[in-house]
């Protein structure tokens, strides 16, 4: 009888382990979904601030079979958009600074060897 009792306890523990793993997996999937949704909302907000049409942004991010060829076309090239782009893309700021410093350091010589800069 003791043998049957230990088997029963073992099966109970195994079942509890499976249930625990299933609950952990469900919680992990919920967190992944929440993180993805938060990321999409942030991306849509960034693109909206850059001057893109919110409907186009939604179609590009969410996507649907009817309008698979949507392009983000209506970008406005004004100072506010450029500033917003700089805020959202700090890497591009670094590249722009390097290019600017390179351009400032380059000296252009004419055929007589005189610097024009």
UniProtKB/Swiss-Prot annotation:
A Pfam family matched in the record: VP2_lagovir
Domain of life of the source: Viruses
Chief location of this protein within or outside the cell: virion
Keyword entries, A-Z: Capsid decoration protein, Capsid protein, Host cytoplasm, Virion
Locations listed in the record: Virion; Host cytoplasm
Domain text: The N-terminus domain points away from the virion surface.
Protein name: Minor capsid protein VP2
Organism: Rabbit hemorrhagic disease virus (strain Rabbit/Germany/FRG/1989)
UniProt lineage: Viruses, Riboviria, Orthornavirae, Pisuviricota, Pisoniviricetes
């Amino acid at each position: 009888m003791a043998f049957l009792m230990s088997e029963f306890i073992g099966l109970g523990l195994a079942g509890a382990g499976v249930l625990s793993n299933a609950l952990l997996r469900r919680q992990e999937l919920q967190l992944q979904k929440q993180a993805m949704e938060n990321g999409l909302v942030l991306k849509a907000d960034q693109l909206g601030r850059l001057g893109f049409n919110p409907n186009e942004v939604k179609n590009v991010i969410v996507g649907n079979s009817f309008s698979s060829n949507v392009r983000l076309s209506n970008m406005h090239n004004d100072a506010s958009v450029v500033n917003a782009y700089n805020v959202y893309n700090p890497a591009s700021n670094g590249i722009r600074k390097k290019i600017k410093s390179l351009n400032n350091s380059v000296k252009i010589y004419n055929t007589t060897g005189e610097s024009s800069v």
